[in-house]
C-alpha cells in the first residue's frame, strides 16, 4: 500500500509540473467584432499620425536646419576673418615673468629646454642673462 501511495504521489507531482495550468481553457478571447474594428482604426490613425509627424520633422530639418547651418557657418567664417585681420596688427608682448620656464634639470628630448607639448607659436623660451 505504501509503495502504491508513493507511485501515485510521484505521478501527481510529475503531472503538475509537465501539464500547463490553463491547458483546459479556451485558446482565444471572446470579444466583440466592433471592439476589434475600433482598435484597428486607432492603430491606423496612429500610423498615419506618425507618418505625417516624421514628414513634418524632415521638412523642418531640410528647409530650416540646413539654411540655418549655412548662415551660422558663414557668420563664423566672417568673424574668424575679422579676428585674423585684427591679430596681424597686435604686437607680441611677452612680459617675461620670473617664474616662467624654470628648468632645474634638462628634459631628455630635444635640446632639453622645451617641454613635451611645446609650441613655438605660443610658448616663448626665456633666455637667461647669466
Swiss-Prot record:
SUPFAM superfamilies: Mitochondrial cytochrome c oxidase subunit VIa (SSF81411)
UniProt protein name: Cytochrome c oxidase subunit 13, mitochondrial
Transit peptide stretch: 1-31
Function (record text): Component of the cytochrome c oxidase, the last enzyme in the mitochondrial electron transport chain which drives oxidative phosphorylation. The respiratory chain contains 3 multisubunit complexes succinate dehydrogenase (complex II, CII), ubiquinol-cytochrome c oxidoreductase (cytochrome b-c1 complex, complex III, CIII) and cytochrome c oxidase (complex IV, CIV), that cooperate to transfer electrons derived from NADH and succinate to molecular oxygen, creating an electrochemical gradient over the inner membrane that drives transmembrane transport and the ATP synthase.
PROSITE patterns: COX6A
Subunit structure: Component of the cytochrome c oxidase (complex IV, CIV), a multisubunit enzyme composed of a catalytic core of 3 subunits and several supernumerary subunits. The complex exists as a monomer or a dimer and forms supercomplexes (SCs) in the inner mitochondrial membrane with ubiquinol-cytochrome c oxidoreductase (cytochrome b-c1 complex, complex III, CIII).
Membrane topology (Mitochondrial intermembrane): 81-130
Subcellular location per the Swiss-Prot or TrEMBL entry: Mitochondrion inner membrane
Gene Ontology MF: a single term: enzyme regulator activity
Transmembrane segments: 62-80
Main location: mitochondrion
Record flagged with keyword Membrane: yes
Membrane topology: Single-pass membrane protein
Key words, A-Z: Membrane, Mitochondrion, Mitochondrion inner membrane, Oxidoreductase, Transit peptide, Transmembrane, Transmembrane helix
Family as reported in the entry's similarity comment: Belongs to the cytochrome c oxidase subunit 6A family.
Pfam families linked: COX6A
Ranges of the Mitochondrial matrix topological domain: 32-61
Lineage: Eukaryota, Fungi, Dikarya, Ascomycota, Taphrinomycotina
Entry GO CC: mitochondrial inner membrane; mitochondrion; respiratory chain complex IV
A Gene Ontology biological process term: mitochondrial electron transport, cytochrome c to oxygen
Organism whose genome encodes this protein: Schizosaccharomyces pombe (strain 972 / ATCC 24843) (Fission yeast)
Pathway: Energy metabolism; oxidative phosphorylation
Amino acid at each position: 500500500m505504501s509503495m502504491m501511495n508513493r507511485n501515485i504521489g510521484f505521478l501527481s507531482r510529475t503531472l503538475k509540473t509537465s501539464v500547463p495550468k490553463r491547458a483546459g481553457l479556451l485558446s482565444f478571447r471572446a470579444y466583440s467584432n466592433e471592439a476589434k474594428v475600433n482598435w484597428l482604426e486607432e492603430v491606423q490613425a496612429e500610423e498615419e499620425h506618425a507618418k505625417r509627424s516624421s514628414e513634418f520633422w524632415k521638412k523642418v530639418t531640410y528647409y530650416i536646419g540646413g539654411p540655418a547651418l549655412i548662415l551660422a557657418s558663414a557668420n563664423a567664417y566672417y568673424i574668424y576673418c575679422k579676428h585674423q585681420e585684427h591679430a596681424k596688427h597686435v604686437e607680441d608682448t611677452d612680459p617675461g615673468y620670473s617664474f616662467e620656464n624654470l628648468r632645474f634639470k634638462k628634459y631628455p628630448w630635444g635640446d632639453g629646454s622645451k617641454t613635451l607639448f611645446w609650441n613655438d607659436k605660443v610658448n616663448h623660451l626665456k633666455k637667461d642673462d647669466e
